[in-house]
C-alpha cells in the first residue's frame, strides 16, 4: 500500500467534486432536509399549546424525560428520535459521488489512464472511497451541529445538551464515517460492473434499507435514541463489512476487463 498513489487519487477526486457544483449541492441538501423536518415540528410545538388528548397519545414516549416539562419532553422525543435518520445521510449521499466517480470517468474515458498506471486496485479503491466519503461525513457533522444549536435556540439550552449526548458524539465520530466508507465502496464496486449511474445507485441503495429499518423500529418501540453498546456493535459490524467489501472490490474491480471494455 503506497500512500502517495492514494493521495494522488484523493486529490484528483476532490478537484472533480469541487468542479461539479450540482453534485456538491447533492451532498448538503439531503442532510438539510432530514434536519429541517423535525426542527419544523419542534417549532410548531413551541408556538402552540399541546392538546390534552395529544399528550395522552405520546405519554408513553415522554416518560423517558421525567425531569423536563411536558412540552419540552415531547420536543425532545421528536428531536432525538429523528436523529436516527442522520445515519441515512452517510448511507445515501456518498453513493451518488461514488457512482459518478467511476461511471462518469468511464463515460469520459478518464478512468483508463488511472487503470493503466502501476497503481494497485486496492489503492485506487481506497483513494476513491476516502475522497467520496469525506464530503458526506463533513456535511453530516455540520448539519448535526446546526441541528443541535437551532433546536436549542427554538426551545431551551437543555435541548442542545440532549442532542450532543455522549452516545451521539461517539456515533458521529465512528459510525457515520464507517457507514460512509461502506456506502462508497459498495457504490464503486457496483459502478465497475454497470454503465448507468442510476442503475448503480438503485442497486447500491439497498444499503439504506437496514438503516431505515432501525430508525422505524426505534420510533415504534418508543426509544428515542440508541445505547452506547448498540453504537459500538454497529461500529464492529460495519467495519467488518468494509473489510469484506475491500476484498470483494479488489476481486471484482477487474482492471483488465474494464480496460478491455473501454477500449
Walk through the language-model features, giving the residues of each.
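Extracellular/periplasmic helix-loop-helix junctions in multi-pass membrane proteins
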Residues: 193-201, 216-236
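Hydrophobic alpha-helical transmembrane segments of multi-pass membrane transport/permease proteins
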Residues: 19-52, 81-95, 207-218, 240-245
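Membrane-interfacial helix-loop-helix connectors in multipass membrane proteins
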Residues: 48-60, 68, 73, 145-173, ...
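Aromatic- and glycine-rich beta-strand/loop motifs that create alpha-glucan
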Residues: 1-31, 262
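A structural motif at transmembrane helix-loop-helix junctions in multipass membrane proteins
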Residues: 18-25, 160-208
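Transmembrane helix boundary and interhelical loop/hinge segments in multi-pass membrane proteins
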Residues: 17, 94-113
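Selective transmembrane-helix segments that form parts of the transport pathway or gating/packing helices
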Residues: 89, 119-148
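Junction motif at the cytosolic side of a transmembrane helix
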Residues: 101, 193, 241-263
Amino acid at each position: 500500500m503506497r500512500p502517495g498513489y492514494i493521495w494522488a487519487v484523493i486529490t484528483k477526486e476532490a478537484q472533480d467534486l469541487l468542479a461539479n457544483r450540482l453534485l456538491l449541492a447533492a451532498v448538503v441538501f439531503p442532510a438539510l432536509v432530514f434536519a429541517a423536518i423535525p426542527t419544523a415540528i419542534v417549532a410548531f410545538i413551541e408556538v402552540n399549546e399541546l392538546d390534552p388528548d395529544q399528550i395522552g397519545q405520546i405519554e408513553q414516549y415522554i416518560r423517558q424525560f421525567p425531569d423536563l416539562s411536558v412540552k419540552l419532553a415531547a420536543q425532545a422525543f421528536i428531536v432525538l428520535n429523528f436523529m436516527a435518520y442522520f445515519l441515512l445521510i452517510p448511507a445515501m449521499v456518498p453513493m451518488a459521488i461514488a457512482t459518478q466517480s467511476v461511471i462518469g470517468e468511464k463515460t469520459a474515458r478518464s478512468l483508463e489512464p488511472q487503470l493503466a498506471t502501476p497503481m494497485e486496485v486496492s489503492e485506487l479503491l481506497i483513494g476513491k472511497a476516502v475522497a467520496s466519503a469525506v464530503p458526506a461525513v463533513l456535511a453530516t457533522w455540520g448539519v448535526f451541529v446546526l441541528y443541535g444549536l437551532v433546536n436549542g435556540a427554538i426551545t431551551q439550552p437543555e435541548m442542545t445538551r440532549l442532542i450532543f449526548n455522549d452516545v451521539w458524539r461517539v456515533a458521529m465520530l465512528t459510525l457515520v464515517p464507517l457507514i460512509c466508507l461502506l456506502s462508497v465502496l459498495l457504490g464503486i464496486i457496483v459502478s465497475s460492473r454497470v454503465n448507468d449511474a442510476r442503475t448503480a445507485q438503485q442497486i447500491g441503495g439497498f444499503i439504506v434499507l437496514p438503516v431505515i429499518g432501525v430508525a422505524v423500529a426505534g420510533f415504534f418501540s418508543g426509544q428515542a435514541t440508541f445505547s452506547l453498546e448498540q453504537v459500538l456493535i454497529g461500529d464492529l459490524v460495519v467495519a467488518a463489512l468494509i473489510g469484506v467489501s475491500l476484498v470483494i472490490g479488489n476481486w471484482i474491480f477487474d482492471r483488465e476487463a474494464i480496460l478491455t471494455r473501454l477500449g
